[in-house]
UniProtKB/Swiss-Prot annotation:
Name of the gene: obg
Cited SUPFAM superfamilies: Obg GTP-binding protein N-terminal domain, P-loop containing nucleoside triphosphate hydrolases
Residue ranges of domain Obg in the record: 1-158
Organism: Ehrlichia ruminantium (strain Welgevonden)
Job of this protein: An essential GTPase which binds GTP, GDP and possibly (p)ppGpp with moderate affinity, with high nucleotide exchange rates and a fairly low GTP hydrolysis rate. Plays a role in control of the cell cycle, stress response, ribosome biogenesis and in those bacteria that undergo differentiation, in morphogenesis control.
Protein residues bound to Mg(2+): 172, 192
This protein's name: GTPase Obg
BP GO terms, sorted: ribosome biogenesis
Domain OBG-type G: 159-325
Any GO MF annotation of the entry: GTPase activity
């Protein structure tokens, strides 16, 4: 399935049904009076946040959405049927903007609903205009037009941990080894072309991790593929920065990613960050110790290590402990995108 995280959609809600102008016509009743019913309301277009969908791919094939019109009122004071609403599931984390780019709403919780286009109200039948001074009104009102607009949908993935790093740092391998993610893995840059989600289970606690495609220098300007996905990091509670320990200059690798985060948004650099030296099975213990010390001196942070053989439970437990401890982090809705 393609990963679509932006879409421009035309919405047209249903028109309200017209009111009816009619009079009661029955045998032996000379002046039956007005009996025109109201028109039905037009159908609305509603978005609902759901864990059953992970991308906006629906809108790739459905860029124009039109709801049903309301039915006109009938004689004998019968109301017209209302048009059926259209309810569309979108991923949790979907933001809705107007055509000018102003944020309208942010669907960031399960089953959160938003009426994106309101259906028109049904017209009023002539029976409703009957008064003591006007016993036989002939006028009625037409149904109102439904809302009609262009909107822009943008998806920002919600996860506990955002995995960042240069291309080929081993982010996908790490995600696959500790979660049920089926991400593609290969020994060349930009293997991951779209964000991948995985769920790890530690001591009956769920941890959602997002593998953000590799960033390179200039990503915030559009170089590589990272600029498209930097926005997804904004929704991650904490960051796990994975660095390939076989690189000659690991400090430069670290600084490169931090610079791109800073140039995109200062808020990203203020997120809690954990650093993981990866592929440690490719170096001897002395080399690893030297690189850990250099990185720790530069970042003033504890450096964790990982390899193919080493269990990931330790670092995952630390991540969960931090999320549970820090009350300032709002833990997002947890779901398993591979078990729906």
């Amino acid at each position: 399935m393609s990963f679509i995280d932006e879409a421009k959609v035309y919405l047209k809600a249903g028109k309200g049904g017209d009111g009816c102008s009619s009079f009661r016509r029955e045998k032996f009743i000379e002046f039956g009076g007005p009996d025109g019913g109201n028109g039905g309301n037009g159908g609305s277009i509603i978005f609902i946040a759901s864990h059953h969908v992970n991308t906006l791919i629906y809108f790739k094939y459905k860029q124009h959405i039109k709801a049903e019109n309301g039915h006109p009122g009938l004689s004998k004071n019968k109301f017209g049927l209302s048009g059926r609403d259209i309810t569309i599931e979108v991923p949790i984390g979907t933001q809705i903007y107007d055509e000018e780019g102003t944020l309208i709403t942010d669907l960031n919780s399960e089953n959160q609903k938003f009426i994106a286009a309101q259906g028109g109200k049904g017209g009023i039948g002539n029976s409703r205009y009957k008064t003591s001074t006007n016993r036989a009104p002939r006028y009625f009102t037409l149904g109102e037009q439904g809302e009609e607009k262009w909107i822009i949908l943008k998806l920002k993935i919600i996860s506990d941990v955002g995995i960042i790093g240069l291309p080929n740092a081993g982010k996908s391998s790490f995600l696959a080894s500790c979660t049920n993610s089926k991400t593609k893995i290969a020994n060349y840059p930009f293997t991951t072309l779209e964000p991948e989600l995985g769920v790890a289970f530690i001591n009956n606690t769920e941890l959602v991790l997002a593998d953000i495609p590799g960033l390179i220098s200039g990503a915030h300007l559009g170089y590589g593929i990272g600029d498209k996905f930097l926005k997804h990091i904004e929704r991650c509670s904490i960051l796990l920065h994975i660095i390939d320990c076989t690189l000659e200059d690991i400090i430069d690798s670290y600084k490169c990613i931090r610079k791109e985060l800073s140039l995109y948004s200062k808020a990203l650099t203020e997120k809690t960050e954990f650093i993981l030296l990866n592929k440690c099975d490719l170096l001897d213990k002395e080399e690893i110790a030297i690189k850990k010390r250099l990185l720790a001196e530069h970042t003033k942070k504890e450096i964790f290590t990982s390899s193919i053989k080493k269990s990931k439970q330790h670092i995952l437990s630390i991540l969960i402990k931090h999320i549970n401890k820090d009350c300032s982090i709002n833990k997002p809705f947890i779901y398993d995108p591979f078990n729906t």
